[in-house]
Amino acid sequence: MKQLLDFLPLVIFFAVYKFFDIYIASGALIVATALQLVVTYLLYKKIEKMHLITFAMVSFFGTLTLVFHDDAFIKWKVTVVYALFALALALSQYLKKPILKGMLGKELIVADKIWSRVTWYWVTFFLACGLVNIYVAFNLSQETWVNFKVFGLTALTLINTVITVVYLYKHMPEEHKKELK
C-alpha cells in the first residue's frame, strides 16, 4: 500500500498530462502530493522526510511553473530533487551517519565499507539521473521528457534498487542470509 501511495502523484501527473497539458498536470501534481502526505499520515501516523522534501519541491517548482507559465521550472524540479538526495547521502556518509544503513541496516547486516560503497553508488546514480534529466528536458520534446520522467527514471530507480539488494545480499554473512529465507 505504501509503495502504491509513493507512485500515485506520478501516475496522476502522467494521466492529467495526457488528457490536458503540462500546466494542469503540474497543478494536479501539487494537489496529489499534498493528498499523499495526508493519506500517509492518516494511515501510518508518520510522514517521512523524503516525502516532505518532495512535497516542498513539487509545491515550489510547480507553483513557479503555473505562475510564470513556463514548464522549465517543473523540469528542473526533478534534477533539484535528485541533487538534494545525492547531497543528503554524501553528507550522511561524510558525517559517518549513513542514511541507507540507518534505513536498512537492521534487516541487512553488512560491513560498513559495503554501506559506504552502496551510498556512493546511489550518490552517483542520483547525480547521473539529474544530469540526464536536464539533457532530456531541454533537448527533446516535452512529451518525451514526461515519458522519460514517468517511465525511464522509475525503471532506472527500480533496476538500481534490485542491483543494490543483490549486492548487499552477496555481502551478508551466511547466518543472516538464512534468517531472511
Curated annotation (Swiss-Prot):
Coiled-coil regions listed: none
Pfam families registered for this protein in UniProt: IspA (PF04279)
Topology term for the membrane: Multi-pass membrane protein
InterPro entries: YciB (IPR006008)
Signal peptide: none
GO CC, one annotated term: plasma membrane
Bilayer-crossing regions: 11-31, 50-70, 72-92, 118-138, 148-168
Compartments where found: Cell inner membrane
UniProt keyword list: Cell inner membrane, Cell membrane, Membrane, Transmembrane, Transmembrane helix
Family to which this protein belongs: Belongs to the YciB family.
Summary of the function given for this chain in its UniProt record: Plays a role in cell envelope biogenesis, maintenance of cell envelope integrity and membrane homeostasis.
Protein name stated in the entry: Inner membrane-spanning protein YciB
